[in-house]
Amino acid sequence: VTAGVYLLIRFNMILNENLCLFLLLISSLTMFMAGLGANFEFDLKKIIALSTLSQLGLMMSILSMGNYKLAFFHLLTHALFKALLFMCAGSIIHNLKDTQDIRFMGNLMVHMPLTCICMNISNLALCGMPFLAGFYSKDLILEVVSMGFVNIFIFLLFFISTGLTVCYSFRLCYYSITGDFNFYSLHSLNDEGWIMLKSMLSMLMFVIFSGSMLMWLIFPTPIMICLPMELKMLALFVSVVGAWIGYEVSKFTMSWVSNSLKFYSYSYFFGFMWFMPNISTFSMNYIPLMLSYNLFKSFDQGWNEYFGGQGMYESMKNNSMFIQFLQNNNMKIYLVLVILWVIMLFLILMI
């Protein structure tokens, strides 16, 4: 997924100013759109995939501002905690018999404690929890954006997208880890698959300690950014507000209202990434699919079958049944045939 970002990091010197401005706008909108769409999803894999798309938008946006080292730093830290998050999600989906809907989960902290610990810590790293892997890169990116010469639109997109990241992370934890177990009542979960657990616990160490280690390795001198107290605390404030909104949105009443008839169009618009599937997938696939369906219906299942396989089979079957009917030892048939032959012979003699 991140190969394109890595290539752009390697060839960052060929990006001109106009291309960087266009890239900044598109990547910021992608980051905001993916974060907003993840808050309306109930598929565990889709939530994590949209989270990856949002973080890719963050990398591309900071790369378009000229900070290629910072984009590479976030690429590495994001790879660590997102790999752990995908492993935890795969373990949970496997234990729930390939069920991906987070509404069927709940109270997994009791049934799968080690997996949930790894999932919680990777979620907190994704949110930018202080001193985890994601904190060092995300906080530095937000401070660089606060210090840079960007307009208020890009500035708000960065911080609102950060709040949305915390929002869907807490929503995911609320549905999957807390509450009641909503799967089959007689279904038992297993948290003793040590092949997965050894890998997850090893990745957990990297998620906790790799942020500071990579910062020491990538940047030769410590980066010190002086900002006013309001801007320094803005990232923390946005994260806290995003966590609170994620908790409120996860409640049943809010979820029911958002899917009601009054607000369904808004939920559809935000959940389907601003009608992106309708523009990119559905509209492009509609004409070829309808054309192939009509050809299949009219030709393959229509005239081709009538004059081809089914028609020949039907005519041969009818002829065989007629001949078999004639060959039955029936006195009436023999008398009728004799009369027909006599009439035909009489007609021939008259000619």
What are these regions (language model features)?
Residues 1-351:
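Core, highly hydrophobic multi-pass alpha-helical transmembrane subunits of bioenergetic inner membranes
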